[in-house]
Each structure stands twice: as structure tokens, then as C-alpha cells.
């Protein structure tokens, strides 16, 4: 009986130790803060840990009920759904699963006259083109301006929209089109955002079209702008073929995508934005443009919550730095080719999702630097596990800088050639450092080595394999390395 008791005690101790060793989440963000009555969504500035909302004139702020969304496994105090007195700023404490905490200060103000309520009179209706510099001030109305149809800003005209303005569109053809030499400046504030909204009789995504920018003017700025229910006919709410700075903006609702950046488009800044309830939040048509995606962006409740990469070539002499935006990057069509003399740097926590039979090619004299960590590995996977991609084909012979560290390369193995059937194919003259990676599952092999005689150019440690159906390592060509002879087609359990 004593022996049984000892075994039981040891078993319970082991279970307790395993449970205590499990790493707990440290995520502790407020992702969304809104009220159902009145229907107001607050602006969250993550860098400052502030929450700001303006409620309509006459609102009783002594018992407002916030609806709060926080990070997975985190809690918030005061809790979501509980009445709170917002007469003065209120501190909300978010506690992560691991017990760490962060405070946000919520300031709720009542709009006394402007920015959506309090004024009298009729809104100004606009239809047609804008051909001279024009400013739309806040008229202090629930709706200050109504745009009927398609508005084209032409010539060298600049449309400036001031803080607190609300613009309503009359229907699905409602659109602002900024010409090649024109500009648009919408800079609101946290307390007085600029709002572009749907007509009263259509409170659905896609109720109006959006804004398209063709010009490269530095005036093109969106700050604290709310785009509500745009994106008609599956268009993006914001489409940029020119230059745009976009900060602290909200896109809520679209029958299409949130933001599309075309080949000629450039973000001068993209940070602290929230895109929600759209198809894809971001659609990017040039790989190097991904470098500008900044901090503090949130992507919530989207039908396909991924950033689309619709570009095969990272052109010569260009650099793409891929940051962790909290959602995957979806590589459509054929995949990615990092061309000669170009460079891709992938930060910790990034996840790439590839279409069926897509590939990731690292060309000669290009550079790939994958900087995963133990807690935030970089993931390369297929969109659907049953539809494999062709893996990473690594040909770069650069003498320094090529690194894949803490990556998981999985769901690989399809195509007619051996180089397309591995998670990582290492070309004959490739120079590369591989550390702490996981290769597999793969329908064929985890790693393929083209020329074993040049294996001295590869440094490796801490790599593992899982689920490689035809063996972990494939030696493609006969050769010798480190005094040992390898046969063509030989399978190894580990890297030599």
C-alpha cells in the first residue's frame, strides 16, 4: 500500500511539474472597445495605451456599457458588459494568462457641437468634380456633407477635410477619385475623427464604393479617419496607385477588401490602423512594399484574415522586410522569387501561407534572412495541408547573410522534379546557415541536397524532421564529403 501511495504521489508531482512548465501567454492587448448604445467605436492608440471615444450630445456617461475584446486568454477589469462611470478617465487593466498586466486609460467625451451632432441646418450635398483647392470644415451636423455619385479631384486641386467631418454617400456608386496631380488630406484627431459612412437606408458592407488615389503628392494623408461599409461591387475601400500615409484609421465593413496597394502605389506610413469585417484586409502587389507595414495594426473578423502577396518577383536591388502583423501572409499564384542582388528579411513570428504548387525561390547572389525565435518561429506552410506547395528552392551563393533560424517548413512535396518535392532544396553552390528548424510534414523529403561535395558551404545545428514520407534527407547526386562517399538517391535520417 505504501508503494502504491508513493507511486501516486510521484505521478501527481510529475503532472504538476509538467503543468507548471507549460509556457503561458503574455499577450495582453485591448483589441476593440465600443458601445452598443449609443453605437460608437473607440479609437485605441496601442503605443500610448489610450482609448478615446466621442459620444453624441445628450449621452449619459455615468453608466455606459463598454463591449471590450482583448487578447486570447487575457482578462480585463472593469469587465466587458459592465456599466462604467466615464465622467472622468477610467483605467482598464488587462491581465495576461501569465499574470503580467498593462493599463489602458479610456477617455469618453460628449460632443457638444460638432463632429456628428449638436448643430442645426442641412448638410452640403456635392456632386461632380473638384478642380480647385477646397476645404470642407466641420459644420457641426450629424452628417456634414453628402456625396452623390462619383467625385473626381482633378488638375492640381487639393481636397482638405477637417477634423470632426462626417461624409455620407448616397449609394453604391459613391466614390472619391484622386487624379494624377491632385491630392486629398483627411487628418482628424482621436477626439474628432473624420467619418465616411453609408447612406441611412443601407447599413450593409458595400453600401458605397471607396477612395482611389492616383497621385504621388505628399499631401495624401489619412489620420483618424473611419471608413464605414464601403467597398461596393467587391472593390477595396481604399485603393492606392500613388502615394499615401495612413495612420490611426478604421475600416469597418466591405464587400471587397480593405486596402489594396497596386504596383505603382507606395505607403509612406501604415501604422495603428484597424481593418475589420472585410474580405482580405490588405492586398499588396509588390513585395518590397511590405517593408512599410508598421506597428499597431489590427485585423479583426475578416472573411479571409490574411495579407495577400500578389507578386512573384522581388526585383533586383530591392529589399523586402517582412514584419509580424499578427496574421499570415498569403502567397497566391506561383509563389515568390527573390531575384539576384535582392534581399528578403523575415522577422520573428511571420507566417507564410502558399497556394497549391507555389514555390519560394532564392536565386543566385540573393539573400534570405529568416530570424525566428523559439517562442516566435517563422512558419512556411500550404494554405491547405492536402494541397502541398513546392517548398523553398535555395540557390544563393552569397558568402554571408543567408540564414534560416527557428523556422517550420511544412506541407511540402509536389511537382515533377526532386527539387519541388522537398521542404528545402539546397542548390549545388548554395551557402547557408540552418539552425533550430523543423522540416515536414512532406509528401516526399524534408531536405534535398543537390551536390554533397559542396556541403561544406552549409552550417547547421539543432534541426529536426517530422513526417517526411520518403525520408528526411535526399542526396541527389553521387559525391564525397568529409571523407565519406554518398550514393545518388541515398536517404539519410539527418543532415550530414
What are these model-derived regions, one by one?
Residues 21-120:
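Beta-rich interaction/scaffold domains
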Residues 3-6, 54, 60, 161:
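Detector for intrinsically disordered, low-structure N-terminal pre-sequences
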Residues 114-496:
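Beta-strand/loop edge motif enriched in small/polar residues
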Residues 1-20:
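Sec-dependent bacterial lipoprotein signal peptides
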Residues 15-16, 76, 98, 108, ...:
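Short stretches within intrinsically disordered, low-complexity N-terminal or propeptide regions
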